[in-house]
């Protein structure tokens, strides 16, 4: 099995972030929808875990697009 390159991982994380932003926006548009809130939270949890693992490995969060406050960016409530 081959290992992912940093560029491939960056691409994958970027796609997940795009879906997460869409999920957060949908949750804002339909407040108090348990499904929409749960979907947004699931993306947040996944990206937060990835971010923490990258931090633990001293990776450049900016390169991977995770140098932001995920809580602020992905909150279903503004």
Residue ranges and their predicted role:
Residues 1-37:
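N-terminal acidic leader/helix
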Residues 11, 66-78:
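Long, non-catalytic architectural segments outside compact domain cores
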Residues 14, 18, 41-48, 75:
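Generic structural signal for well-ordered, non-transmembrane alpha-helical segments
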Residues 34-70:
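Short, charge-rich amphipathic interface segments used for partner binding and complex assembly
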């Amino acid at each position: 099995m081959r290992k992912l390159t940093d560029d491939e991982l960056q691409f994958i994380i970027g796609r997940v972030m795009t879906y997460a932003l869409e999920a957060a926006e949908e949750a804002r548009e339909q407040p108090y929808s348990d499904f929409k809130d749960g979907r947004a939270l699931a993306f947040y949890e996944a990206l937060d875990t990835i971010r923490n693992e990258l931090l633990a490995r001293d990776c450049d969060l900016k390169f991977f697009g995770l140098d932001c406050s995920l809580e602020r960016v992905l909150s279903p409530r503004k």
